[in-house]
Amino acid sequence: MYHIDVFRIPCHSPGDTSGLEDLIETGRVAPADIVAVMGKTEGNGCVNDYTREYATAMLAACLGRHLQLPPHEVEKRVAFVMSGGTEGVLSPHHTVFARRPAIDAHRPAGKRLTLGIAFTRDFLPEEIGRHAQITETAGAVKRAMRDAGIASIDDLHFVQVKCPLLTPAKIASARSRGCAPVTTDTYESMGYSRGASALGIALATEEVPSSMLVDESVLNDWSLSSSLASASAGIELEHNVVIAIGMSEQATSELVIAHGVMSDAIDAASVRRTIESLGIRSDDEMDRIVNVFAKAEASPDGVVRGMRHTMLSDSDINSTRHARAVTGAAIASVVGHGMVYVSGGAEHQGPAGGGPFAVIARA
């Protein structure tokens, strides 16, 4: 079993690896122990956001120097999930997850944090947003749970996926082979990819039966969702990266995790209740929180708590950017700062207009 350490480090630019270098050089983490890095980069979070790819490349190169591996080999052993968009008060940062063998001499009472990773195969352009992506993701989630030593779905608290999107070149490739992509709108393809990935998580966690999952389910049947899913689409990969985070009696981490679901983009009360479930009940105790991870979206019916919003009809700013700013501010108002992980686009991730979240804290 494992001992998990988690570090949140600020970023001064998308290519900034100084925080990671400092963790390694001061001996706080061994480079070989790093299994995942989740980051918020200061791009637009849309199709042409290359800050995600740049950040991943720089982090992989940094770790590669310490591991004496080429960057592409680092990306095969470390799950990199870069989420673009730090609108509003959101602050660019990385969350580094390190995993080493459990420390039997210091085994705490109760369940503690554990984490596992897995990767799907590369997807053909015509598979993105469809049943193939759903089933492949479900299989990867189960492998990540086994990798983490999470024995029961009840002990699973958050599943993070990084998934691909469609580009004009990918669309042309599909058509050249006589295949039709799920959409020809590259921005819309992000939603399809996130949605299919989320439904794959729902299949793995038994929140949705396989009989209800067909191509047409994605972005159509909003009754289908996962309360544990967080999916982020990007231009920098062709497969899905999966991180499963939960708890285990055998884990020896000093950390714990709890999760909840925001009913809408401003549901700070749910975040507060989940934090309190970890025994954090005052502002003085907020420093126990390592990070909060959340999904956010503009309510697709155009209404928040009975009042009309204009996030979906703004021709200048994509709705995912609005949603990140709103939910980022709501969570920041609870924890007291904006260095939290909020990802836009919550298709099939929690209720329409809301989204799942998780809190990692020191026990």
Curated annotation (Swiss-Prot):
Quaternary structure note: Homotetramer.
Catalysed transformations (reactions): cyanurate + H2O = 1-carboxybiuret + H(+)
Enzyme Commission numbers on file: 3.5.2.15
Protein name, entry field: Cyanuric acid amidohydrolase
GO molecular function, one term: cyanuric acid amidohydrolase activity
Keywords attached to this entry: Hydrolase, Magnesium, Metal-binding, Plasmid
Gene Ontology biological process terms, A to Z: atrazine catabolic process
Site positions (Important for substrate specificity): 320
Family the entry assigns: Belongs to the cyclic amide hydrolase (CyAH) family.
Domain of life per record: Bacteria
Binding site for Mg(2+): 297, 346, 349-351, 354
pH-activity dependence text: Optimum pH is 8.2.
Stored InterPro entries: AtzD/Barbiturase (IPR014086), AtzD/Barbiturase_RUA (IPR043008), AtzD/Barbiturase_RUB (IPR043006), AtzD/Barbiturase_RUC (IPR043007)
Description of how activity is regulated: Inhibited by barbituric acid.
Region of interest: RU A: 1-104
Domain notes: The monomer structure is formed from three repeating units (RUs) that share the same structure as one another. The monomer, the active site and substrate all possess threefold rotational symmetry, to the extent that the active site possesses three potential Ser-Lys catalytic dyads. It is possible that any or all of the three active-site serines may act as nucleophile (albeit only one can do so per catalytic cycle).
Binding positions (substrate): 52, 83-84, 194, 232-233, 324, 343-344
Role summary: Responsible for the hydrolysis of cyanuric acid, an intermediate formed during catabolism of s-triazine based compounds in herbicides such as atrazine and polymers such as melamine. Catalyzes the hydrolytic opening of the s-triazine ring of cyanuric acid (2,4,6-trihydroxy-s-triazine) to yield carbon dioxide and carboxybiuret, which spontaneously decarboxylates to biuret.
Pathway: Xenobiotic degradation; atrazine degradation; biuret from cyanurate: step 1/1
Class of the enzyme per the UniProt entry, highest EC level: hydrolase
Catalytic residue positions: 162, 232
Annotated segments matching region RU B: 112-249
NCBIfam families: amido_AtzD_TrzD (TIGR02714)
RU C as annotated region, ranges: 255-363
